[in-house]
Amino acid sequence: KFHYLIYSHDDMYFCPNWAKQLKDEIKKIQHNKYYLSGSMIEQNSGHIKYDCGSTIEEFNEQKLLNNLHNLKIDDHQGSHFAPHCVHVDLWKKVDGFSKEFNPGIASDPDFNMKLWKEGVRIFKGLSEFKVYHFGSLTTRKNKNVKQNRGDNTFLKKWGITTGFFKKHYLRSKTKFKGPLEEPKKNLTYYFDLLKSKIKLLYVSFL
């Protein structure tokens, strides 16, 4: 029987020592309510911007490995990106990814929201668990795949935008400081919430 589930895109290259970083982090947590993710290196975006090619044919593996120690990032808060690791019991409890997000747009934040509702507060991107991502070759850049309107599906399902969820709940793109707390309901929160509700009203008529 296996205890952990690692979800990855099929256009990702796992950098050395990723498994040890993940194993050590899981040992430190000592419970099953967590969502641990890697740090993406991409040609034009990602957590770390570094060009080693946009396809497997162009991939300069040696360049990546020779410079990996220079590609720095802190452990980061609220990551919702692949690759990620969760306990298999937690995956089963929330029924994994939701089918209405097929073929995948916004499926990650939806999964995170289901985990949040289940009481998960550790959403941690690991600085030393690095992958090189060639950039959505399976879905977004594939002309044969019809894209789902995942952001609208998320909005209708949860009543807020993915951006609102990532900003006020997951605190995405900030340095990891520990388990997350409930959103701070200040002026910015309510202003952004109002924008979410206005957008919800709009997409409801589409």
Task: Mark where each language-model region is.
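Short beta-strand-to-loop acidic/aromatic patch adjacent to the donor-nucleotide binding site
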Residues: 2-13
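Acidic donor-binding/catalytic loop of UDP-sugar-dependent glycosyltransferases
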Residues: 12-25
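Short beta-strand-to-loop element that shapes/binds the nucleotide-sugar donor at the catalytic cleft/hinge
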Residues: 36-53
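Active-site donor/metal-binding and catalytic loop motifs
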Residues: 41, 102, 124-144, 153
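A recurrent flexible, glycine/aromatic-enriched loop bordering the glycosyltransferase active site
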Residues: 65-89
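Donor nucleotide-sugar recognition loop
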Residues: 77-83, 92-125, 129-132
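Catalytic core of nucleotide-sugar-dependent glycosyltransferases
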Residues: 128, 141-168
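Non-catalytic, C-terminal membrane-associated alpha-helical segments of glycosyltransferases
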Residues: 145-149, 164-206
